[in-house]
Amino acid sequence: MSKTQILHISDTHLGKRQYNLDFREQDVYDTFSQLIDIAIKEHVDGIIHTGDLFDINDPPNKAEIVAIRELKRLKEAGIPFIVIAGDHDSPKKFTAIYPQKILEEFDLIKFLSKPDTPYKLGEITIYGISHVPNVAKERLKELLSRLKPENKKSILLLHQGLKEVLPYEGAWQIQIDDLPKAFSYYALGHFHTRRVFQLDGGRIIEIAGSPDILREEEIEGYEKEGKGATLIDFSGDIPTIQKINIDVRKQYVVTLNTNNLREEIRKLREKYDTNNEKKPIFHIILEGKSIPKNVLMKELQEINNFAPYWRIYKDNTKEKDEKDVKIDLPTDTTIENLIYNYLVKIANFSETEARMIVDIINRADEREYVKEELMKMIGVENDNKKN
């Protein structure tokens, strides 16, 4: 019995610059290179790519150069690269062409541009339909109904929204019942998190996912399923699959409480600062009391010492209107008590920090204008001020 293995990859999005960062664009190229390394190392019989090879229809020169360089490695190893287009790299204008056509012109890929014309890889027949938008979903269903593979060992490549995965109006074009039943394997792109559906008769729907974390919503899926490619073994009558993970830059959604921000950042560094060459990205959820933006950003700058990029993902801090804040003061209050109460109850300093500031002030020059300015700052006029 001959052993036939195919590597399924998808949604590589070459040219993608997450948050417009140079190093994130390079990360995307590095993950693609890792996938090619896997294909060569595993001596696979072919690679199938289910759409969004490029992030846009008119990719930057660097993305095309990376694609050409890596696909030449595959060609030299005798491994065919069979591909369809996704919604990102499909033409948006009638006069535009698929970037895959350029690669096919140099005999680097096999672009499945005709649904009824399969590619034969040994005893396996591979069909493919590039992304079809919502406005033409009835036409897509008609195309699917007409597909009849020549043999049992057959693969259908698609890049579509599937209702069972994304059941929102306008987000899907087909559902599982729309798939032609004669295929043994359905390889899907478009979704960035891995997923597998086992159907009757040993049929499999498999979503390879994107090989890198391209949106913060993918982090949870990455932590559960990893990122990389799927190795499909067609040696038996029923295909079997194996996930192969690759090394990607980690991203985390973390919660920081502004009530004790410095300590929170210290713990964050202690937990995530590693010797890994690819430092992580943080998506920060803020909790606690609202603090002045300049104070907040100054504190958060500390994260730059152990992460190349961070962003405030959600701000759940509670706003406090200083005009509505009232401090109950005893009749015999002192300037020190006024300052202390302001620092703790309005400026959100800790009690320790407030005492330290008051102590510093007490050790400073006792000139009258210092007290006057401090009293203005906290909104208390000096009734004893001499005119």
Swiss-Prot record:
Mn(2+) 2 binds at residues 52, 87, 159, 190. The keyword Hydrolase applies. GO terms for molecular function: 3'-5' exonuclease activity; DNA end binding; endonuclease activity; manganese ion binding; Y-form DNA binding. This is DNA double-strand break repair protein Mre11. Keywords: DNA damage, DNA repair, Endonuclease, Exonuclease, Hydrolase, Manganese, Metal-binding, Nuclease. Nuclease activity is regulated by Rad50. Part of the Rad50/Mre11 complex, which is involved in the early steps of DNA double-strand break (DSB) repair. The complex may facilitate opening of the processed DNA ends to aid in the recruitment of HerA and NurA. Mre11 binds to DSB ends and has both double-stranded 3'-5' exonuclease activity and single-stranded endonuclease activity. Binds 2 manganese ions per subunit. HAMAP family: Mre11. Homodimer. Forms a heterotetramer composed of two Mre11 subunits and two Rad50 subunits. Interacts with HerA. Its EC number is 3.1.-.-. Coiled coil: none annotated. Its cofactor is Mn(2+). Induction: Part of the nurA-rad50-mre11-herA operon, these genes are cotranscribed. The keyword Glycosyltransferase does not apply.
